[in-house]
Amino acid sequence: MELNEVYQYTKEHMEKTIDAMKRDFATLRTGKVSTAIVEPIRVDYYGTPTPLSQVGSVIASDATTLVISPWEKNLLKGIEKAIQEANIGVNPNNDGDVIKLFFPPMTSEQRKEIAKDAKALGEKAKVAVRNIRKESNDKIKKLEKDKLITEDQSKKAHDEVQKYTDDYVKKIDDMVKSKEEEILKV
């Protein structure tokens, strides 16, 4: 392993952490409803747990309503059951053609609670970034111990990994701040 590989590993894994946090953020409810809130839901499709988006279309018809149109009408009951089991805070309204999910406007208490969740997801991402830093630094130490790099190169490499860490922690902080503002905005 070379230093470039360590840098690449560090960047790739820190970027994956950001991507994972973005996916987690997408499931948080903001002032307007998002189709991402139902993405984790799996529907029993002929015995196979299948993502909701693969058995029908999901659209936000307005700020508080999601409409799910299954491609096969016989899936309506299964979709309805999956939504109830997912416990996303709404009851599905099945009209025989589509399923509508009506999300009530959020109270300020709910907004504060969801903003706290966003902050917790940010902290989780920062811990992941710091763990990646530790793994990268361990790899650098091993390269130095195996005499593949000099002490000076090792010091520079540790500084470079710390720079990546600082950059990604700042990105995470900025994303959390932006998400909190979006959640708390009425």
From Swiss-Prot:
Which GO BP terms apply?
cytoplasmic translational termination
- Name any GO cellular component annotation: cytosol
Q: Does the keyword NAD apply?
A: no
Main location group: cytoplasm
What is a single Pfam family found in this protein's UniProt entry?
Answer: RRF
In Gene Ontology terms, what is one molecular function of this protein? ribosomal large subunit binding
Domain of life assignment: Bacteria
Compartments (UniProt record) = Cytoplasm
Q: Which Gene3D superfamilies match?
A: 3.30.1360.40, Ribosome-recycling factor
**CDD domains the UniProt entry points to:** RRF
NCBIfam families the UniProt entry points to: frr (TIGR00496)
PANTHER family attached to this UniProt entry: MITOCHONDRIAL RIBOSOME RECYCLING FACTOR PSEUDO 1, RIBOSOME RECYCLING FACTOR
Q: What does it do? A: Responsible for the release of ribosomes from messenger RNA at the termination of protein biosynthesis. May increase the efficiency of translation by recycling ribosomes from one round of translation to another.
Q: Which family does it belong to?
A: Belongs to the RRF family.
Recorded protein name is Ribosome-recycling factor
What organism, scientifically named, is this protein from? Wolinella succinogenes (strain ATCC 29543 / DSM 1740 / CCUG 13145 / JCM 31913 / LMG 7466 / NCTC 11488 / FDC 602W) (Vibrio succinogenes)
The primary gene name is frr
